[in-house]
Amino acid sequence: MTDDDIEIRRLAREDAVLYRDIRLEALQANPEAFGSTFDVEDAQPLSLFSDRLGSSTVLGAFRDTELVGIVGFAVQQGQKEAHKGALWGMYVRPAARNAKVGRRLVEAVCNHARQQVELIQLSVVVDNEQARSLYARLGFLDYGVERNALKQAGRYYDLVLMAKDLSRH
């Protein structure tokens, strides 16, 4: 798989089955990396995933017709925080991780976000060096650590809080 084989586009309601499949895969493969759980989302009807795609910005990376990566974006609510957005739900299938899919997804979501916000924030599990390194290479800076932010199977996970000033890049 090469960089040229990948198409990045916004997912639509019609992509709900593909989105549900990759989202559940992400939650099962890396349960420590997400606030939600496989069991909770697996029990949801397909309409929940379709509605999420209709009301949220979720970008997908496609190799032909296969969805190989996803990332979400949301503008913060509230008048005083409307200049900020959040990158969420990032996942790239293992077979696509060396094809710059993650990089292309983050670049695409930043380009999309730049039209709406000045600052994009994210959180990532401290131990996820590969993701942290990717975000840092793309201009995200650490601004804090949330201790014991997630608890999975009796273990606590700290989150590194990162942000990128889109008005400067």
Identify the residue ranges that each predicted region occupies.
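Terminal substrate-recognition subdomain of acyl/acetyltransferases
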Residues: T2-D5, R13, D158-H169
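Acetyl-CoA-dependent GNAT
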Residues: R10-A95, V106-A108, H112, D165-H169
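Glycine-rich acetyl-CoA-binding "A-motif" of GNAT/NAT acetyltransferases
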Residues: E66-G69, Q130, Y156
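Conserved glycine-rich acetyl-CoA-binding loop
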Residues: K80, G89, R93-E107, V125-S133, ...
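Conserved GNAT acetyl-CoA-binding A-motif
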Residues: A113-S123
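Conserved catalytic-core motifs of GNAT/GCN5-like acyltransferases
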Residues: Q121-V125, A136, L141-Y157
